[in-house]
Amino acid sequence: MDSAISSPEIFIALVVAAHAAILALRLSVSLYRA
């Protein structure tokens, strides 16, 4: 099963997506509490 993108790129994309999701959650929580 070979894909166009390699495994390290998938891992980096997951880390970036998780970081963005955490930042969005923290922002929404701070806006909700304000």
Swiss-Prot record:
It comes from the Bacteria. The chain crosses the membrane at residues 5-25. The keyword Thylakoid applies. Keywords: Membrane, Photosynthesis, Photosystem I, Thylakoid, Transmembrane, Transmembrane helix. One of its GO terms (biological process) is photosynthesis. Pfam families: PsaM. It is found in: Cellular thylakoid membrane. Its main location: membrane. GO terms for cellular component: photosystem I; plasma membrane-derived thylakoid membrane. It is a single-pass membrane protein. The keyword Membrane applies. Belongs to the PsaM family. NCBIfam families: PS_I_psaM (TIGR03053). This is Photosystem I reaction center subunit XII. The lineage of its organism: Bacteria, Bacillati, Cyanobacteriota, Cyanophyceae, Synechococcales.
